[in-house]
Amino acid sequence: MNDLPFTLDQLLILKAIAAQGSFKKAADSLYISQPAVSMQVQNIEKQLNVQLLDRGGRRANLTDAGHLLLRYGDRILALCDETCRALEDLRNLQTGTLIIGASQTTGTYLMPQLISLFRKKYPQIMVQLHVDSTRHICWNVANGQIDIAIIGGEVPLELREILQVTPYADDELALILPCSHPFSQRQEIQKEDLYQLHFIALYASSTIRKVVDNILREHDIHSSRFFIEMELNSIEAIKSAVQSELGAAFVSASAITKELQLGLLHWAKIQNVILNRNLSIVTNPNRYRSKAAEKFSCEILASFQPPTVHPCG
């Protein structure tokens, strides 16, 4: 068999340089010397007969060839990690690692409950939770870096033939108001009342905002006419802003359980409008599925439904 033109260690070095932007920082992150990093890069460039890095500027940037190699290198390294986890499963079915992905709201307010149930049943299995945008989570599932994910948005179009999407539960969305707002005296408001509110909104690219806009549009309510007081990228920041009487907001009902119990926020229903989004389980059927992932899916997800949140008052 001919010698391979590069090693796994060399791929890790190239990945570190791309992430850190310099040979020295890459060396520090890998706990090896800078000359060792330089030598490994020179060796792989010599073996492949291509230049992988542009060393002309202050930052070490990948060339087109470097980007191409790293794209395949990420897949190779992910497959190696997958292999190790499969062997770990084979050695002992009661141990291992479960890597879960979730979009922002789901990861913050739902996943801790699910992970707690799983850890009580399987304390030997280590759980890693990755919280990111729906798009990034789906790509990590596709690449084998995440075992199983729960998302509240749609899978990217380019991944729909690769990933398996299973409906899981409904996530009700709530219109929240400061308790001092005149509308807080009502359990239900009219559609026209929305145009009188000042809104604290999630960024336009957020899943919840897209879902709310689409549902409202179906009821002939046009969010483009809303007065947006400010945009924030954090549900916690939005809740704080609403409590500070800066405006109203749409959030997941799962995020306001404590605030409703303590009377810190008011949940106003909109007449004849139901605000729900679908939560889905995302897996990659073409990747190895660990025993830990099977247990989480079959024993935890199958038996647990997110608790229903009710407006107080």
UniProtKB/Swiss-Prot annotation:
Coarse class of the protein's main subcellular location: plastid
Stored Pfam families: HTH_1 (PF00126), LysR_substrate (PF03466)
Annotated HTH lysR-type domain residues: 6-63
A GO molecular function held by the record: transcription cis-regulatory region binding
UniProt DNA-binding residue ranges: 23-42
Keyword list, A-Z: Chloroplast, DNA-binding, Plastid, Transcription, Transcription regulation
Subcellular location: Plastid, Chloroplast
Gene Ontology terms: cellular component: chloroplast
SUPFAM superfamilies: Periplasmic binding protein-like II, Winged helix' DNA-binding domain
Function: Trans-acting transcriptional regulator of RuBisCO genes (rbcL and rbcS) expression.
Family to which the UniProt record says this protein belongs: Belongs to the LysR transcriptional regulatory family.
Protein name as it appears in the record: Probable RuBisCO transcriptional regulator
